[in-house]
C-alpha cells in the first residue's frame, strides 16, 4: 500500500475480501470466530490510514470507531502493537527527511518489540529477523524484479490456512 501516493480503496476492498476468505480457514485451525486473522490487521490499518489521510474530518470518527472495534478482535493478530507497527511502516516509507526516517524507524522498532512483549527473547528475535530482512531486501531489492505475482501473499496466506485446517481436521 505504501508504493502509491495514496492508499486506494480498491486495494483495501481486495484486502478486506481476502481477509474474509482467510477467516474461514483461520477458524478451522482453532481460532475463535471473533479473533481476526492478520489480513484483517492489514485491512483495518490500511482503512484507518486512508480515512485519516483524507482532506475532510468527515472520516475521523469512522476511523476511530474502526480502531476501537478492532481492539477486542485483534488478540490473534499482534493486537494494537501490530496496528502501530504497520502504521509506523507506512510513515517510514513516506518519510522525506532523515530526521523523519530516524523517528519513524525508532517508532517502528519499538512497535516490533511490543508485538511480542510477553517474551523478551521473542521480541528481540522478531526485531533482529525484521532488520536482517530489511537489510538484505533493501540492498538487493533494486536489482531483483518482482518474484511472486501481485496478491501472492494474501492468496498464499488464505490457502496455507485452508491446508492447515484440513490437516487439523484429519
Language-model features: where?
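Alpha-helical transmembrane segments and their immediate juxtamembrane cytosolic regions
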Residues: 1-170
Amino acid at each position: 500500500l505504501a508504493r502509491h501516493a495514496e492508499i486506494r480503496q480498491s486495494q483495501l476492498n481486495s484486502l478486506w475480501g481476502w481477509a474474509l476468505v482467510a477467516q474461514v480457514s483461520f477458524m478451522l485451525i482453532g481460532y475463535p470466530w471473533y479473533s481476526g486473522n492478520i489480513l484483517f490487521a492489514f485491512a483495518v490499518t490500511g482503512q484507518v490510514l486512508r480515512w485519516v489521510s483524507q482532506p475532510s474530518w468527515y472520516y475521523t470518527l469512522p476511523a476511530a470507531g474502526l480502531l476501537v472495534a478492532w481492539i477486542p478482535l485483534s488478540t490473534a493478530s499482534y493486537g494494537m502493537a501490530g496496528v502501530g507497527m504497520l502504521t509506523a511502516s507506512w510513515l517510514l516509507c513516506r518519510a522525506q527527511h532523515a530526521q523523519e526516517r530516524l523517528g519513524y524507524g525508532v517508532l517502528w522498532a519499538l512497535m516490533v518489540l511490543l508485538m511480542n512483549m510477553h517474551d523478551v527473547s521473542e521480541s528481540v528475535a522478531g526485531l533482529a529477523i525484521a532488520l536482517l530482512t530489511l537489510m538484505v531486501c533493501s540492498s538487493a531489492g533494486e536489482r531483483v524484479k518482482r518474484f511472486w505475482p501481485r496478491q501472492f501473499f494474501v492468496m498464499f496466506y488464505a490457502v496455507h490456512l485452508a491446508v492447515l485446517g484440513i490437516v487439523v481436521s484429519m
